[in-house]
A protein has these predicted regions:
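N-terminal helical cap/lid subdomain that shapes the substrate entry/recognition surface
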Residues: 18-107, 111
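Short, flexible loop segments at the rims of nucleotide/cofactor-binding pockets, characterized by
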Residues: 91-96, 120, 188-189
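Glycine-centered short loops/turns at secondary-structure junctions
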Residues: 112-113, 189
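Asp-based, Mg2+/Mn2+-dependent phosphohydrolase catalytic module
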Residues: 2-20, 103, 107, 123-230
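Conserved phosphate-coupling serine/threonine residues in phosphotransfer and NTP-handling enzymes
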Residues: 30, 119-121
Length: 230
């Protein structure tokens, strides 16, 4: 777990506090534009093994079920995974970008409610993509793949986050972009705001309370004025 500080008490007053005591954020596809890079790294790795990875297969296996597409190849899985991971970090170093609207949204919400990141991304990859993002100081702690046994769509990541925060899941909001992430948060008892990206459109988001077109809609939904909190 990556921790900046313990959760502070919630800010008194305001519509959002009446609804929620904390906000948990997915990373890839919500904060950072990286899922197309992960697809590229997996496709290139599988091509080395003579397997063609289509976007539809990637969406079904990785983004919806949360399973590894490398299982499509036979042979030395660890060698293929190692090559894929190295290639992915190269792509992250060169091309990972903060999704438009994220910085402004976090500036508005920071200090209003406790916030944390709950991601299936491995810690090394997470830190690589955030080297220059400027986002991490907005969060009280971060859970990466190494911090729990079962990944999304299992509810364990969000249950672990609520336990770490000392918060009732029913009083927390999760912000997700994928079917597996929405499923994980809903199964853990959180309210979910879904912001499907291009690679996740067409998924089952029926358990999300809200379906947003842009992250910039979130502050207004929570009753904030959209101005950075001081």
């Amino acid at each position: 777990m990556l921790a900046r500080k313990d959760f502070p008490g919630t800010v008194s007053g305001g519509y959002a506090e009446a609804m929620f005591e904390g906000i948990f954020w997915d990373n890839d596809g919500v904060l950072m534009e990286t899922e197309h890079l992960y697809f590229q790294a997996n496709a290139e790795a599988l091509a080395r093994a003579g397997v063609e990875l289509t976007l539809a297969l990637f969406q079904e296996i990785s983004l919806r079920r949360g399973e590894s597409v490398l299982a499509l190849a036979s042979g030395d899985g660890e060698e293929l995974r190692s090559w894929r991971d190295g290639r992915y970090r190269e792509l992250l170093s060169a091309e990972a970008q903060v999704i438009p609207g994220v910085t402004e949204t976090l500036q508005c919400l920071h200090g209003q409610l406790p916030m944390a990141i709950v991601t299936s991304c491995r810690r090394e990859n997470f830190l690589q993509m955030h080297r220059t993002s400027g986002l991490l100081d907005y969060f009280d702690f971060i859970l990466t793949r190494e911090d729990y046994r079962n990944s999304k769509p299992d509810p364990e990541p969000y249950r672990a986050a609520c336990t770490r925060a000392g918060l009732d899941p029913g009083r927390c909001l999760a912000v997700e972009d994928s079917e597996r992430g929405v499923t994980a948060a809903a199964r853990a008892g959180l309210t979910v705001a879904a912001i499907p990206g291009d690679l996740n459109r067409g998924g089952d988001f029926s358990t999300a309370r809200w379906h947003l077109d842009s992250i910039l809609q979130l502050p207004g939904l929570l009753g904030f004025d959209g101005q950075p909190h001081r």
